[in-house]
Swiss-Prot record:
Belongs to the FGGY kinase family. GO terms for molecular function: ATP binding; glycerol kinase activity. CDD domains: ASKHA_NBD_FGGY_GK. This is Glycerol kinase. InterPro entries: ATPase_NBD, Carb_kinase_FGGY, Carb_kinase_FGGY_CS, FGGY_C, FGGY_N, Glycerol_kin. The keyword ATP-binding applies. It comes from Brucella anthropi (strain ATCC 49188 / DSM 6882 / CCUG 24695 / JCM 21032 / LMG 3331 / NBRC 15819 / NCTC 12168 / Alc 37). Sn-glycerol 3-phosphate binds at T12, R82, E83, Y134, D245. Its EC number is 2.7.1.30. The keyword Transferase applies.
């Protein structure tokens, strides 16, 4: 009797394979980091071959830890870092260039050209997205324009475009020997090439961006049997779920009703609110996106606030400044001071995402005096995540007209008690961490399990969700308002830094 579901979680810094049981509990997992490549300022790349090699490794290692074989796995789902873009040779399987990562800003000149001609919001009605360096379409355009032979191969159908999910699916299902070239609606919605209403590639946008349709994958639902895995360790297992990482976390957090919201604290922060089958356009700097689409059902949409730098700021303090040895030391250092000492850190390393969408912003530390020490800087770095989330939540309430009664939180930074309490204080709502914090991988597992009947319905997902910890607001409204207003002043100082 098959008892388990596998989930490939391919993130910005590492690849993991996690095996779940019917209750959504983790049976075994394995993780392997990959190199972050920085060829120039603002450029961030990954080696797709390294990611594929690491994926194979973690699958085999997790199965070995659990003492399981392929026949014990009912199906496998994939969740992935979104927007990260690559183009590879259909015949050889070799990437034509490294994967260009979601936070990479090399397309800023293209963005400037298009926004000058038609404004940043000219594609919002169709795609839900502003023209930005963030999304895949212009990253693909950059590859086509700058990699010798790429455009010719793409136009001939000899080069395949994909986000990371597409690359993994193609390799898992045979690669050059019959690999399936697909993506799901959630990942497609982040390319800025798909119409949110039709869930198809939009010919007008393809013409505008000068992208040949011959290189694009087929768009499928988030939960259906796509094919069988050919990898020896999972040979014959059905590949049955794909969700972009933030949509997967929404699904794994059981935010399945309109108005329910989650926030993932990782390299960046990503808050999504379920808006049901209704497409809600944003007037306050948020993104409209596809939350998920189950096989045969109507799509469910979401509002999203994307924040580029949160956990990455802690890594920067560790790697670039050396004021902490391990990322986990940040809370201890921040607790050496009673408050932020009126120091504010705006981590606009690659501009500001939601709700500002200012590519020209750059990071600043404001409010420094001789009194400030590294404890204040550590605390300001943590608080920066919470302030940015407050900005997004305020915009979400304005767009949706729905007051959020609690925020479901997940991701690596939720183990930081100081941050979670401050987040509850600055939002003035409870923050809830679930019992299982690996909600991104769990969401992909749920999508894959539903497709093969392992879980009968989304009701099973709701019943599996359990509270791990709940933080309640303890700060006065006057104090939280004072702190947030000072943060907003610091943000204004960061804007327009790049001419």
């Amino acid at each position: 009797m098959t008892q388990f579901i596998g989930s490939i979680d391919q993130g910005t810094t590492s690849s993991r394979f996690i095996i779940f049981d019917r209750q959504g509990d983790i049976v075994a997992s394995d993780q392997r980091e990959h190199e972050q490549i920085y060829p120039k300022a603002g450029w961030v790349e990954h080696n797709p071959i390294e990611i594929w090699r690491n994926t194979q490794h973690v699958i085999a290692a997790a199965l070995k830890k659990a003492k399981l074989k392929a026949s014990d796995i009912a199906s496998v789902g994939i969740t992935n870092q979104r927007e990260t873009t690559l183009l590879w040779d259909r015949k050889t399987g070799a990437p034509l260039y490294n994967a260009i990562v979601w936070m990479d800003t090399r397309t800023d000149e293209l963005v400037s050209r298009y926004t000058k001609d038609g404004g940043a919001d000219q594609l919002r009605a169709k795609t839900g997205l502003p023209i930005s360096t963030y999304f895949s379409g212009l990253k693909l355009r950059w590859i086509l324009d700058n990699v010798p032979g790429a455009r010719e191969k793409a136009e001939a159908g000899d080069a395949l475009f994909g986000t990371i999910d597409t690359w993994l699916v193609w390799n898992l299902t045979g690669g050059t020997e019959g690999g399936i070239h697909i993506t799901d609606v959630t990942n497609a919605s982040r390319t800025q090439l798909m119409d949110l209403s039709t869930l198809q590639w939009d010919e007008d946008i393809l013409r505008l961006f000068d992208i040949p349709s011959a290189c694009l994958p087929e768009i499928r639902s988030s939960s259906e049997v796509y094919g069988e895995i050919t990898l020896p360790s999972l040979s014959g297992v059905k590949l049955a779920g794909i969700l972009g990482d933030q949509q997967a976390a929404l699904f794994g957090q059981a935010c399945l009703e309109p108005g329910e919201a989650k926030n993932t604290y990782g390299t960046g922060c990503f808050m999504l609110m379920n808006t049901g089958e209704k497409l809600v356009p944003s007037n306050y700097g948020l993104l409209t996106t596809v939350a998920y689409k189950l096989d045969g059902a109507k799509p469910v949409y979401a509002l999203e606030g994307s924040i580029a730098i949160t956990g990455a700021l802690v890594q920067w303090l560790r790697d670039n400044l050396g004021i902490i040895r391990n990322s986990s030391d940040i809370e201890t250092l921040a607790r050496t001071v009673e408050d932020n000492g009126d120091v504010y850190f705006v981590p606009a390393f690659s501009g500001l995402f939601a709700p500002h969408w200012q590519d020209s912003a750059r990071g600043i530390i404001a409010g420094l005096t001789r009194f400030a020490n590294k404890g204040h800087i550590a605390r300001a770095a943590l608080e920066a995540s919470a302030y940015q989330v407050r900005e997004v939540l305020d915009a979400m309430v304005k767009d949706s007209g729905v007051e959020i009664t609690e925020l479901r939180a997940d991701g690596g930074m939720t183990i930081n008690e100081l941050l979670m309490q401050f987040q509850s204080d600055i939002l003035d709502v409870p923050v809830v961490r679930p019992k299982i914090i690996e909600t991104t991988a769990l969401g992909a597992a749920y999508a894959a399990g539903l497709a093969v009947g392992y879980w009968k319905s989304t009701k099973d997902i709701v019943e599996n969700w359990q509270v791990g910890h709940r933080w309640h607001p303890r700060m006065s409204a006057e104090e939280s308002t004072r702190l947030f207003n000072a943060w907003e002043k610091a943000v204004q100082r960061s804007l327009g830094w790049i001419e």
